[in-house]
Amino acid sequence: MYLKLMLNFIIFNMANNAMAQSLNVFGQPLLLCCNEPKTGFYRDGFCNTGSNDIGTHVICAEMTAEFLSFTKSKGNDLSTPNPFYAFPGLKPGDFWCLCAIRWKEAYDANAAPKVKLESTHEKALDFVTIEQLIEHAIK
């Protein structure tokens, strides 16, 4: 229990630091992606990133059955709950901060989910173009 509390404290402090400087793909303040389920590398609801975020979880995407199946086939099962990480499992319609590289893989395979541009971190542009994101923007 102590370890979990300490981990939450560290993540909270890292998230507060990341949030202070986070911008979206339009150079505007990053907006909330989703609070239910709580998403983001820091589980703060935002697609914030930092040096500890190896996967670069910066693209706010709306889950689809097609994408959930695609990512599971790549070894990342997002649909099955994992109580150890307090992860509820995702279903179509949920929003989640995806790894930029995984979203690009899905894009290349015609399986990319729609994205909330205002909630997608500017760091995503290191991996995909703004045109690719706009093509999959939630209208």
Across the structure, where does each feature detected by a protein language model lie?
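A charge-rich, low-complexity, intrinsically flexible signal that marks solvent-exposed coils, linkers
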Residues: 17-139
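Short, positively charged and aromatic/hydrophobic N-terminal segments
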Residues: 2-15
